[in-house]
From Swiss-Prot:
Function noted in UniProt: Carries out a dual function: signal transduction and activation of transcription. Activated STAT proteins play a role in repression of dauer formation. Neuronal expression is held in check by negative signals through the TGF-beta pathway that target the daf-3 transcription factor.
Family listed: Belongs to the transcription factor STAT family.
GO cellular component, one term: cytoplasm
Localisation: Cytoplasm; Nucleus
InterPro entries reported for this sequence: p53-like_TF_DNA-bd_sf, SH2, SH2_dom_sf, STAT, STAT_linker, STAT_TF_alpha, STAT_TF_coiled-coil, STAT_TF_DNA-bd
Alphabetized UniProt keyword annotations: Activator, Cytoplasm, Developmental protein, DNA-binding, Nucleus, Phosphoprotein, SH2 domain, Transcription, Transcription regulation
Name by which UniProt lists this protein: Signal transducer and activator of transcription 1
Subunit structure, as described in the record: Forms a homodimer or a heterodimer with a related family member.
One Pfam family in the UniProt entry: SH2
Main localisation: cytoplasm
UniProt-recorded Gene Ontology molecular function terms: DNA-binding transcription factor activity, RNA polymerase II-specific; RNA polymerase II cis-regulatory region sequence-specific DNA binding; sequence-specific DNA binding
Record-annotated SH2 domain positions: 477-574
Length: 706
């Protein structure tokens, strides 16, 4: 059923489980009847011996006839039993293959896609139905756990049945035991993988953690309350520690390496580093970390001054180039009838994160993790290389989503905004543009005459909008991404005098007011005030600057035709009231900061206010479905073993004599002519390798289709 849908595979697996149930009942019944027949044959054998000893030859002949008929019946019964044993092996094998295909789809496709969407959501990509999708995935995990456990029980019961059965010299029972053992081992392997992969980070921590700041995250076990797992894990602690990303990658190669890493590797300290697994009303078995804090991080030390070993120096990373991960783990636990050596050792990793100790590191840390979230695979396969260059189209999607997420703005970047941004990154008048490298995007100066990169410039604008200009941006009062020359031309083409707000491209995190005024002869002259930074706007808000600037008093419109007074009314309560204030309790009278634009005499005010003269450049005033029974409902230690009473019925260990001798020559002839393993009964016992690394190597994530 390769290529079958998930629903088709689920139906097929459910049908196989039901068939295995019926076949188990038939095997149990047939073996019981066969044991009874052997018992009767043994009794008749003893009767014949006794009659022969008593010289009652006429009775011996009659009993031998009865024994011959009984031997024929027993041989036919054994043939039927052997066929049913073969049938259940085939069905268990089919069920295991169906479970393998379903598990591959579930973990390698559905859960993988969910995790990838979760990763992209951290840079603003929409993922509104994340809870619904995860609940649907949990239902599939629970279904697979139930089906696996049922198949496993039928296989274990059959093994116990065969070991109790009379052992004939044909070797068929031993061959069947070998196949059932292989099936059981594969089912256990699938179950271990299913449980371990069901432990996920349902709420990722922030991509950039700050020391001495709390972080919020949540882990969840998607296996839910199946297999009696609740009684093992509810109120069990989930621990968390921070490890280097290099160590996280090592775990993708060596699944067991986490034991050493979690016990010995320490790169930081987390307070409140454990929480209890609890089951909520929605059936989620989860642990929420709401009060954990990263109190210390051990950054790699920079190379010593004058270090001559360039290779060593090059391997050293700045603090903002180092990635980490949170490792979550549960104390190993045992479940059901599995051996003590087969404990569930469950752990999971967060997405890579950055750590900062100071606000000045935020810009560099944000871009490193942004690039990873957008373009890297969620698989920590050490054989895959990092994406170092992408097309502008992919970069534009990333910027648009990150902008909305970071600023919280309702108004997204428009196509014209992105076109303006592309001019900062692409070579002018070149048709065949090369991919944009991370270095060009985040490290290289935006222009030769500027000391900052494109990302530093864009990041500072996002900070400015978030902290000071969000209302201006959302209402469309801030044009923002437009060049000084284009702003001047646009304003001069308006029928009436106007002003606009644009972001400086020669200074980081600054907004400039551009305006056009008319001379007495009707000539329009554009002016651009020196840009205001966040620090400037802390001293006097942008709305107050616009309201108090003499040169803007007679300009009624913001470009293109927005009533200035309508805009200012939005800020009257929070700005003008704050500036006006009331009487001071100390007796002082309050003062007011007023912004004045120095237009160098090129503009004669139409009002009686005096002209303002000064420097050549205007400047701001301030500084810058299942069976009726479910194996998952039974949790005894010997849930896979038969009762003693049933075992006694099906066991012939105390039977004396050779079984083949009891069955007679007719049995041998029948068995010789019957081959339960001919070409019509061959079945495939080759299973998909569900190792973690192999699962993840099926996918190489691309942020956007090429």
């Amino acid at each position: 059923m390769m290529g079958s849908s998930s629903q088709e595979l689920q139906t097929a697996l459910t049908d196989v489980s039901k068939t295995c149930h019926h076949l188990w009942e038939e095997n149990k019944d047939l073996q019981g009847r066969f044991v009874n027949e052997l018992g009767e044959l043994q009794r008749l054998q003893m009767v014949i011996a006794q009659l022969e000893q008593q010289q009652r030859l006429e009775n011996v002949f009659t009993v031998k006839q009865q024994m011959t008929e009984l031997q024929k019946r027993a041989a036919t019964l054994y043939e039927h039993l052997t066929q049913k044993r073969n049938d259940i092996v085939i069905k268990l094998n089919d069920g295991t293959n169906f479970a393998t295909m379903l598990q591959t789809q579930l973990i390698g496709e559905k859960l993988f896609s969910w995790k990838n969407a979760q990763k992209l959501a951290q840079i603003g990509m929409p993922f509104d139905n994340r809870e619904q999708l995860l609940d649907e995935i949990q239902i599939e995990f629970e279904f697979l756990a139930d089906q696996n456990w049922q198949l496993n029980m039928f296989s274990c019961w059959m093994l116990d049945l065969l070991r109790r059965a009379p052992q004939l010299n044909d070797g068929l029972a031993q061959a069947t035991i070998g196949k059932l053992t292989a099936i059981t081992e594969q089912l256990n392997k699938l179950l271990f993988m299913l449980v371990s992969q069901s432990f996920i980070v349902s709420v990722q921590p922030e991509p950039v953690l700050k020391t001495q700041h709390k972080f919020v995250t949540e882990v969840r076990l998607l296996i839910g309350d199946k297999l009696g797992i609740r009684q093992h894990l509810v109120n069990t602690n989930v621990s968390v520690k921070i490890i280097a990303e290099d160590e996280a990658k090592q775990l993708s190669v060596d699944y067991d390496a986490h034991k050493e890493i979690r016990n010995n590797k320490t790169v930081g300290t987390i307070s409140n580093d454990f929480e209890k697994l609890t089951m909520n009303e929605r059936g989620h078995l989860a642990a929420k970390f709401n009060n954990s804090k990263l109190t210390r991080i051990a950054h790699r030390k920079p190379p010593p001054k004058g270090a001559s070993d360039l290779k060593c120096a090059a391997s050293m990373q700045a603090a903002t180039d180092q990635k980490y991960a949170l490792l979550f783990f549960i104390t190993p636990f045992q479940m059901g009838n599995l051996s003590k050596e087969e404990q569930f050792d469950v752990w999971t990793l967060s997405l890579p994160i950055m750590v900062t100790v100071h606000g000045s590191q935020d810009c560099d840390a944000q871009v490193a993790i942004l690039w990873h979230r957008a373009f890297a695979s969620i698989s920590r396969n050490p054989n895959t290389t990092d994406v170092t260059a992408v097309t502008w189209d992919n970069l534009a999607i990333m910027l648009r989503n990150k902008f909305s997420l970071f600023t919280g703005a309702r108004r997204p970047l428009s196509d014209s905004d992105l076109a303006y941004l592309s001019e900062k990154m692409l070579m002018p008048n070149v048709a065949d543009q090369k991919p944009i490298t991370f270095h060009r995007f985040a490290k290289q100066a935006m222009r030769d005459d500027l000391p900052f990169s494109f990302w530093e410039w864009f990041f500072s604008i996002m900070q400015l909008i978030k902290q000071k200009l969000l209302k201006f941006w959302d209402e469309g009062w801030c044009i923002g991404f437009i060049s000084k020359n284009d702003a001047s031309q646009s304003m001069m083409m308006c029928q009436h005098s106007s002003f606009l707000l644009r972001f400086s491209d020669s200074q980081t995190g600054a907004v400039s007011i551009g305006f056009v005024c008319e001379e007495a002869d009707g000539q329009k002259i554009p002016f651009h005030l020196a840009p205001f930074t966040i620090k400037d706007l802390d001293q006097l808000s942008l709305a107050s600057r616009i309201a108090s600037c003499p040169q803007l008093k007679d300009i009624r419109y913001m470009y293109p035709a927005i009533d200035k007074e309508e805009m200012l009314r939005f800020f009257e309560s929070e700005e003008r009231h704050r500036v006006g204030g009331g009487d001071s309790p100390t007796g002082y009278i309050q003062s007011e900061i007023v912004m004045v634009a120095k237009t160098n005499g090129n503009f004669r005010r139409m009002s009686n206010a005096p002209s303002m003269f000064g420097a050549d450049s205007p400047s701001p005033l301030s500084v810058q479905s299942k069976l009726d029974w479910s194996p998952g409902e039974v949790h005894q230690n010997h849930m896979m073993e038969m009762s003693d009473e049933l075992g006694q019925i099906l066991t012939v260990s105390d039977m004396s004599g050779d079984v083949e001798t009891l069955l007679g020559p007719a049995f041998k002839n029948n068995i010789t002519n019957y081959n339960p393993h001919d070409g019509n009964h061959q079945h495939n016992l080759h299973f998909v390798d569900m190792s973690q690394q192999g699962m993840m190597q099926q996918h190489h994530n691309q942020f956007y289709p090429s």
